[in-house]
């Protein structure tokens, strides 16, 4: 592992079992961990201004290389002074490599991400070929052919000026067989070297690079990937690829992956953000999580809530919420709950498709996640993380579980 103070440092303050509280020091300020990272997929967190996201307490967001390559393009963002200046965000930014999106076009699963682009674009997005050089695909905006390679991914992320760039990898689906997964993992490792070579020669000063662990649900392939990434000149590790068909299999995959990673390295779990998954992931020693769950739920009229039997969510559009004068969650400090907006009102504006409903629900969900992680950090420092996790899983709100 590389430890270049000019790029990024990771300091561990407290431990409680395998859970740990720390700080990622980036060129744009500290990020307290464990941390949940909201998605600013196209340069904004859906429904929120950058100032509002920071006001909730977030210190880092994730930008999407694939979407920002398609539009508005890295050159336009670079001319604006980089993604920080472009979106008015002066704290840390991590960018993914674009690999998940282009491979989802081939393997399925990207449709949910690009729904906001309009129905007319669905048929345009298509992967044309996966080669050693990279991946050829069609833009979902205009059907033009684009190429994303390890070098191009790093070039785009350099132009965006993120604090942390992720290497280009192939994200295999669960249904890929072992033989394909093995070939894919080996290719990801070759692409890792190409990413690092490009970044070493051309990368912007201060930009850290995280490697990505692949290997599917195969313990030997995961172990091999951990060894390759751990030996490389990277600043941290992200765990990607399929984690199984259900939460039990995900726990199993993480259980034999995380112990094979360097203890001092910051560990990032890609694309996972359910409340119970975060609680379990922190207990395993993971530090950073990103996911579209808070904003995706809000778009569909759902709010996070301390309801383990209901997957920690409320559907405010349901008829039973009409006439309910209670807040989404008692004592929640979000704009919806603290602002006096009842479930009854949120039911009405959600069912009538008012933009205010999405904004209030996004604010609530992001606040809930931020307080969940804040509580986890405090519990780790107090040596009480197991108790905190049990209370969350039993139905306590984050602000009541400490």
List where the protein language model places each region:
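C-terminal extensions of enzymes
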Residues: 1-25, 31-35, 47, 168-175, ...
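Glycine-rich phosphate/ribose-binding loops and adjacent secondary-structure elements
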Residues: 1, 186-189, 196-198, 202-328
């Amino acid at each position: 592992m590389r430890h270049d103070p000019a790029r990024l440092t990771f300091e561990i303050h407290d431990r409680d079992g395998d859970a740990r509280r720390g700080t990622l020091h980036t060129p744009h300020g500290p990020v307290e961990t464990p941390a949940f990272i909201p998605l600013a997929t196209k340069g904004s967190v859906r429904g929120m201004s950058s100032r509002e996201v920071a006001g909730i307490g977030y210190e880092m967001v994730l930008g999407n290389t694939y979407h920002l390559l398609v539009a508005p393009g890295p050159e336009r963002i670079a001319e604006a002074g980089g993604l920080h200046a472009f979106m008015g965000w002066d704290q840390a930014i991590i960018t993914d490599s674009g690999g998940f999106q282009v491979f989802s076009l081939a393997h399925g699963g990207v449709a949910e991400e690009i729904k906001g682009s309009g129905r007319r674009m669905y048929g345009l997005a298509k992967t044309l070929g996966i080669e050693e050089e990279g991946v050829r695909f069609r833009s979902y905006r205009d059907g033009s052919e684009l190429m994303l390679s390890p070098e191009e991914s790093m070039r785009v992320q350099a132009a965006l000026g993120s604090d942390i760039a992720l290497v280009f990898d192939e994200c295999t689906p669960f249904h890929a067989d072992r033989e394909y997964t093995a070939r894919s993992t080996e290719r990801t490792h070759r692409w890792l070297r190409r990413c690092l070579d490009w970044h070493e020669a051309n990368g912007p000063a201060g930009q850290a690079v995280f490697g990505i662990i692949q290997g599917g649900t195969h313990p030997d392939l995961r172990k091999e990937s951990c060894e390759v990434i751990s030996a490389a000149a990277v600043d941290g590790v992200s765990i990607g690829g399929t984690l199984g068909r259900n939460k039990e299999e995900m726990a199993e995959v993480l259980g034999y992956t995380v112990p094979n990673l360097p203890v001092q390295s910051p560990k990032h779990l890609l694309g996972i953000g359910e409340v119970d998954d975060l609680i379990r992931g922190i207990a395993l020693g993971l530090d950073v999580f990103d996911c579209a769950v808070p904003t995706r739920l809000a778009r569909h009229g759902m709010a996070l809530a301390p309801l383990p039997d209901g997957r920690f969510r409320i559907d405010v559009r349901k008829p039973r919420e009409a006439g309910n004068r209670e807040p989404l969650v008692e004592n929640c400090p979000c704009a919806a709950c603290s602002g006096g907006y009842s479930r009854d009102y949120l039911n009405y504006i959600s069912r009538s498709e008012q933009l205010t409903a999405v904004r209030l629900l996004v604010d609530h969900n992001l606040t809930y996640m931020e307080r969940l992680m804040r509580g986890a950090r405090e519990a780790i420092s107090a040596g009480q993380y197991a108790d905190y996790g049990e209370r969350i899983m039993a139905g306590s709100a984050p602000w009541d579980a400490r």
